[in-house]
Every structure is written in structure tokens, then in C-alpha cells.
Amino acid sequence: MKQKELWINQIKGLCICLVVIYHSVITFYPHLTTFQHPLSEVLSKCWIYFNLYLAPFRMPVFFFISGYLIRRYIDSVPWGNCLDKRIWNIFWVLALWGVVQWLALSALNQWLAPERDLSNASNAAYADSTGEFLHGMITASTSLWYLYALIVYFVVCKIFSRLALPLFALFVLLSVAVNFVPTPWWGMNSVIRNLPYYSLGAWFGATIMTCVKEVPLRRHLLMASLLTVLAVGAWLFTISLLLSLVSIVVIMKLFYQYEQRFGMRSTSLLNVIGSNTIAIYTTHRILVEIFSLTLLAQMNAARWSPQVELTLLLVYPFVSLFICTVAGLLVRKLSQRAFSDLLFSPPSLPAAVSYSR
């Protein structure tokens, strides 16, 4: 990767770390029922609320960058040359790891928590039958909904690229509306909610990126401050879109300025993580399930001392992040060396439609 692109990869690395922390928190802290240390319940609630407050910053910049990086395919690459890399590649990973997660999480729950009632779980990974699993995947009710979204977003943005401005306005309205009139499927709600950020990157990303690089924020400090106040006010009324748009610009500006001032190395931790986001994204959910099912049984039975309990509640998301990151990188390395990266890169489509590398 060229040096000038490293800061973008660093942002991708940060985003996937926040995603891992998000899943680590929601699968653990809300399900605790027993607290021994007087600060344990407070600390658990702090993690839950901290996770909630990160929502406007976690996925929007991730999707903006995803859209920005494929704008060439939107503008100038024929459909036939897009099928392999932009659709088939992602569909393969979505389908393969959707099945892997389903089999793994079903087995883990039968083994570690056979008494757990999953009848009302709306995640394809907890499906009782093949039909339920397929329904969950089709409606984006899966922990892998990000991959589902990438396929849908690309197709929509490429087909309607000549109607970018009016459609972007429509996507903004849909993103706001889904907060008040959601669909029956939580994953589809997330897909609709994040559509403006991807389309913004795909259609207008080049212009925005130029502004991020060339326009100093201090020259427009008053306007930026007023916009931030307005964004926070809207967020308090459950409309996070404006705050997310502001966060995209601020996060990119900070990382770009950091690279310009201090430089970035391709071997830095965030860059390595950013280069392997799909591997970490697809594998971490299985590990998080193992951690939560194992620890919840011990914590709710009060089998550890109050001091151990409090320490675990304090550091668990960071420990989970570390293990999931290392595991994801190892699985990617194994995939490359033992399976020609088949776990994350599909067999090529027939030559007639394959993307020319």
C-alpha cells in the first residue's frame, strides 16, 4: 500500500477494533445477574452506555471509506469486470462464514449453555433449521450484515450513479426514517441506516477527501462548532446521522494530519489490523460467543472473588479484542498458506466474466 493511503487503513483498523469491542460488550455485560463487588454493576452499566455512545462513530466512517475505495468501479469499470471482485468475492465470504458461524454458535450453545432459550433470537447464527438460516441471511439478520450491505450498496450505487444527488437525499431520509419506522429485521435496519455513508464515499468521496486534506478546520472553527452542537442536539432526539457525518470528517482529518506530521508505518499495529478487517470481522463473533458463555456461567454463579470479578469487568473488552485480533490474523495466515486463502478469497469465476488482475 502506498504511504499516502496508510492513514485510511489505520481508520479501518480502528473501526474493526470498535466492532469487536461492541460485540464483546453486548454479549456479556447485559446478561450479568449477580454482582459481588459494590462497583461491579456500575462498571457494567458504564461499558453498556459507552458502547451505546460509540454507535455514531463506529460504522459510518467504515462505510464511507468502503464506498470511497471502490469509486473507480462505480465510475469506469464495466459490470462484467466488477462481478468477481466487488460481488462474488464478498458473497463467497458472506455465505461461507455465515454457515461457519451458524454451525459454530449452534454447537457452542448446545455444549456450554444447553438451557439457553434461543427461540426468540433473530440472528441467522441461532437458526433452528436451514429455512430459518436462509431467511435470516436474506433479511440481513446476521452478524455479517456488513458484508451483505457491501453487495447491496455497490449494486445500487453503480446502477444509479447518474442520479447521485437526488438519491443521496432519499437515502438520508430513509436513514432517519428507519429510526422511527423500522423494518421487522434488525440487520436490514442497519443496512438502510448506513446507506448514506457508503453512497457519500462512492459518489462524492473524492471531493470530500480533497476538502479533508486541503481545508484547515481552524479557518471554519465557528461553523464547525455550530454544526457539532446541532449534530449533538439531533442525536439527543435519536437522529444520529448528522453527528455521524461530522464524525467522518473529524476522524479522517485527525488521522490525515497525524500522518502528515508524524508519518505512518505499514507494519504498525492498526495498519496490519486494517489490512485484515474481513478476517477479524468474520472470526471474532465465534470467539466472543465462547468467552461470554464461559464467563457468564462463572460470574452469575459468583464463583470468583469480588476483586477478580471487578478486574474482569474492567478489562474484558480489551482482552477479548486482543485475542480476537490475534486469532483473526492467524486464521488469515493459515488460510493463505494452507488453503490458497480460500477462506477469504473465492475460486475465480469463469474467464468470461472474471476480473482482469
Curated annotation (Swiss-Prot):
Pfam families reported in the protein's UniProt record: Acyl_transf_3
Chain ranges passing through the membrane: 13-33, 50-70, 87-107, 136-156, 163-183, 197-217, 232-252, 311-331
Membrane-topology annotation of the record: Multi-pass membrane protein
Cytoplasmic-side segments: 1-12, 71-86, 157-162, 218-231, 332-357
Primary location group: membrane
One example of a Gene Ontology biological process annotation: enterobacterial common antigen biosynthetic process
Leader sequence residues: none
Periplasmic topological segments: 34-49, 108-135, 184-196, 253-310
Protein name: Inner membrane protein YcfT
Family per similarity comment: Belongs to the acyltransferase 3 family.
